[in-house]
Amino acid sequence: MERAIQRSDAREQANSERWDGRCGGTITPFKLPDESPSLLEWRLHNSEESEDKDHPLGFKESWSFGKVVFKRYLRYDGTETSLHRTLGSWERNSVNDAASRFLGVSQIGCTYSIRFRGSCLTLSGGSRTLQRLIEMAIRTKRTMLQLTPCEVEGNVSRRRPQGSEAFENKESE
């Protein structure tokens, strides 16, 4: 009974991300604060007159464990310094620490999601596959942030699947 109460309290506290777990730390898997732009900044950047449409202010990412979701918007300008900073927004240990608050004896769903330049990628699995999910999330984040706008558009929205290309090649022979 006590464990169920603690888990319920942890969920409520995680939703507001104000809970101090140990030594003043928070329960969130993220090491950087949310950097969401103000409404005015967002409107100026995305206005018709803006010449910087191919370079978003940043990206959104989230980790979820069961019904508890942790979200962040991080500034990213495409530089090597910015890439290094944002790749360190969470680490294996911080994700494991946050997840351990919600993972009990039964398996729950774990999900990592990243949205950048209009493309969204979500990785999910059960709590027993969390370590593999973390490895995949690290690679996915690095790859996605290093793509140019043309690569994102070309690979995601305008490119035909490889299977159809192979099929056309066989027909022409």
Swiss-Prot record:
Residues 1-34 are annotated as: Disordered. One of its GO terms (biological process) is symbiont-mediated suppression of host innate immune response. It comes from Cucumber necrosis virus. Pfam families: Tombus_P19 (PF03220). InterPro entries: Tombusvirus_p19, VP19_sf. This is RNA silencing suppressor p19. Viral suppressor of RNA silencing which binds specifically to silencing RNAs (siRNAs). Acts as a molecular caliper to specifically select siRNAs based on the length of the duplex region of the RNA. Homodimer. Signal peptide: none annotated. Keywords: Host-virus interaction, Inhibition of host innate immune response by virus, RNA-binding, Suppressor of RNA silencing, Viral immunoevasion. The keyword RNA-binding applies. One of its GO terms (cellular component) is virion component. GO terms for molecular function: RNA binding. It comes from the Viruses. The keyword tRNA processing does not apply. Residues 1-21 have a biased composition (Basic and acidic residues). Belongs to the tombusvirus protein p19 family.
